[in-house]
């Protein structure tokens, strides 16, 4: 009988794509993978598409919500816990793996109550609420950034799981030195899109002389695609605009520089691909974790920080023109990013699951 692992991850791509990377590795080894998620997160689309059965629970985030949400919270948590317990009893997993996000809370607590081995992985440079609460209950604690958890948790630095196709991209210098013509600018708003980037980037590019404008590939989010089209048209700037990019490896291979938020997934992929970036952290992220993610790259010389409060078309245009004037800067940033990457994170996390399951 195959080993069965239940993975808990939901909400945004920052939790789901690393979990899918681990799930794919486990499945390649003959392990049966079951998912726990919500119907309103990105997992509702991505997980069934990847071929994994999914158990639904009804839960949402609480931090940053109003009083009404907090008053209803105990009842919602009890409902989610009962749903998680039902799923755990049904599937009887050998191991439960939580990758953060609100879905991990009830599932992780349920695993502990049923004495199922629990492992957790934190993708951000600051521990999220669910993982902070589950860490004392977990048999193994893993982190994407070194030193995220306090020493008492004895967390293992595994790195952040990314898609294998991104890790397999050619070495940064060879890739970038082969480039000819104007440089390539990739703009990423995350799985939700980032309105401020959709509005500011075309205005910034319009300020640049035509001869120094980069080619642009802009992922703007499905809900904001029409607005981005209008913004680029109004600015008189040509760009390839897409709601979502399925093949991120191809996008990173194409790019010389990325303008993006600093979510865990994006930062991990920048390091794995070996590419420099202008990072604009989302200022309302819980515990300002995107700023902490960004700082890890900035300190190493792999990225430049551009806080949203300082973001303007003129400032962004200035930075893009400055970086584009010296191609060696792209290469040095890319190499610095690649050196930060911890290779094989998906395999490492998958191996820990099997070690616990067999041990």
From Swiss-Prot:
GO terms for cellular component: plasma membrane. It is found in: Cell inner membrane. UDP-N-acetyl-alpha-D-glucosamine binds at residues 12-14, 124, 163, 191, 245, 264-269, 290. InterPro entries: GlcNAc_MurG, Glyco_trans_28_C, GlycoTrans_28_N. GO terms for biological process: carbohydrate metabolic process; cell division; cell wall organization; lipid glycosylation; peptidoglycan biosynthetic process; regulation of cell shape. GO terms for molecular function: UDP-N-acetyl-D-glucosamine:N-acetylmuramoyl-L-alanyl-D-glutamyl-meso-2,6-diaminopimelyl-D-alanyl-D-alanine-diphosphoundecaprenol 4-beta-N-acetylglucosaminlytransferase activity; undecaprenyldiphospho-muramoylpentapeptide beta-N-acetylglucosaminyltransferase activity. It is a peripheral membrane protein. Belongs to the glycosyltransferase 28 family. MurG subfamily. Its EC number is 2.4.1.227. Cell wall formation. Catalyzes the transfer of a GlcNAc subunit on undecaprenyl-pyrophosphoryl-MurNAc-pentapeptide (lipid intermediate I) to form undecaprenyl-pyrophosphoryl-MurNAc-(pentapeptide)GlcNAc (lipid intermediate II). Pfam families: Glyco_tran_28_C, Glyco_transf_28. This is UDP-N-acetylglucosamine--N-acetylmuramyl-(pentapeptide) pyrophosphoryl-undecaprenol N-acetylglucosamine transferase. Transmembrane segments: none annotated. It comes from the Bacteria. It catalyses: di-trans,octa-cis-undecaprenyl diphospho-N-acetyl-alpha-D-muramoyl-L-alanyl-D-glutamyl-meso-2,6-diaminopimeloyl-D-alanyl-D-alanine + UDP-N-acetyl-alpha-D-glucosamine = di-trans,octa-cis-undecaprenyl diphospho-[N-acetyl-alpha-D-glucosaminyl-(1->4)]-N-acetyl-alpha-D-muramoyl-L-alanyl-D-glutamyl-meso-2,6-diaminopimeloyl-D-alanyl-D-alanine + UDP + H(+). It comes from Nitrosococcus oceani (strain ATCC 19707 / BCRC 17464 / JCM 30415 / NCIMB 11848 / C-107). Coiled coil: none annotated. Keywords: Cell cycle, Cell division, Cell inner membrane, Cell membrane, Cell shape, Cell wall biogenesis/degradation, Glycosyltransferase, Membrane, Peptidoglycan synthesis, Transferase. Pathway: Cell wall biogenesis; peptidoglycan biosynthesis. The keyword Transferase applies.
């Amino acid at each position: 009988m195959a080993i069965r692992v239940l993975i808990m991850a939901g909400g945004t791509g920052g939790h789901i794509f690393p979990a899918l990377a681990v799930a794919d590795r486990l499945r390649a080894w003959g392990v049966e993978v079951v998912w726990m998620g919500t119907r309103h997160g990105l997992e509702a689309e991505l997980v069934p598409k990847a071929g994994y059965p999914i158990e639904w629970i009804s839960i949402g985030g609480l931090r940053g919500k109003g009083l009404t949400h907090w008053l209803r919270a105990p009842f919602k948590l009890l409902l989610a816990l009962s749903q998680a317990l039902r799923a755990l009893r049904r599937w009887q997993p050998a191991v439960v793996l939580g990758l953060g996000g609100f879905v991990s809370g009830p599932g992780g607590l349920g695993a502990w109550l049923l004495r199922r081995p629990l492992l957790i992985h934190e993708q951000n440079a600051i521990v999220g609420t669910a993982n902070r609460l589950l860490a004392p209950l977990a048999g193994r604690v893993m982190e994407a950034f070194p030193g995220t958890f306090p020493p008492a948790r004895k967390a293992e630095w595994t790195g952040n799981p990314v898609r294998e196709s991104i890790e397999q991209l050619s070495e940064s210098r060879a890739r970038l030195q082969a480039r000819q013509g104007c440089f390539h600018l990739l703009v990423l708003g995350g799985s939700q899109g980032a309105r401020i980037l959709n509005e500011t980037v075309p205005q910034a590019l319009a300020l640049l002389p035509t001869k120094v404008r980069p080619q642009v590939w802009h992922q703007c989010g499905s809900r904001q695609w029409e607005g981005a089209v209008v913004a680029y048209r109004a600015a008189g700037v040509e760009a390839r605009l897409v709601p979502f990019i399925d093949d991120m490896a191809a996008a990173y291979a194409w790019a010389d520089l990325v303008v993006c938020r600093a979510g865990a997934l994006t930062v991990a992929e920048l390091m794995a691909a070996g590419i420099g970036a202008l990072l604009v952290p989302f200022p309302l992220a819980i515990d300002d974790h995107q700023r902490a993610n960004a700082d890890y790259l900035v300190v190493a010389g792999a990225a430049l920080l551009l806080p949203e409060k300082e973001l303007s078309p003129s400032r962004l245009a200035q930075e893009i023109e400055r970086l584009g004037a010296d191609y060696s800067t792209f290469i040095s940033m890319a190499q610095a990013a690649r050196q930060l990457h911890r290779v094989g994170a998906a395999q490492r996390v998958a191996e820990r699951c099997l070690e616990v399951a067999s041990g």
